[in-house]
Amino acid sequence: MSYTPQQHRVNKKLGECLAIANQHFSREFPCPTVTYKLRGKAAGKAYLQLNEIKLNQVLFSENEDAFINEVVPHELAHLITHQVFGRVRPHGNEWKYVMEKVFNVPARTTHSLEITSVQGKTFEYRCDCTTYPLSIRRHNKVIRNQSTYRCQQCQQTLAFTGLQLS
């Protein structure tokens, strides 16, 4: 299998982080499988039982350095945490420990990447005080009478304006 330069950088960062974790915990962690088929707004996702990391190729291409320095250690920390501590909260103290004390990376639970290119369709909803963009999934739930959404300030039920934003 041939790797792109981006994928080489991911593998190199994984190797570096694994070596640090191996030394810190005095054990050998298996190298996870990495795939680039994650869709939507998530940057990455760790599959604990499979020892696999899925990365969002579109967001990766647009934010390569952030992925290498933040997303790859973040997802690997989930796998390491699971293998060392077992079943714990996804972003709990054990995960924070691996991020900050082992990998020396700030323990952020969400990314701040620009997601316009992967966002999908959004629809405008409003109440008396403001407007909200709702995803196509939430919009469809409203249309099918499966859900309603309320304003965070005035608690009024949001109503579709008829406008598709993107």
Curated annotation (Swiss-Prot):
Cofactor(s) this protein cannot do without: Zn(2+)
GO cellular component terms, semicolon-separated: cytoplasm
A family per Pfam: Zn_ribbon_SprT
Note on how the cofactor is bound: Binds 1 zinc ion.
Residues in SprT-like domain copies: 21-160
Family: Belongs to the SprT family.
GO MF annotation list: zinc ion binding
Keywords of this entry: Cytoplasm, Metal-binding, Zinc
Coarse class of the protein's main subcellular location: cytoplasm
Active site feature: E75
Biological process per Gene Ontology, one example term: response to stress
Organism field: Vibrio atlanticus (strain LGP32)
Compartments where located: Cytoplasm
Annotated gene: sprT
Binding site for Zn(2+): H74, H78
Protein name: Protein SprT
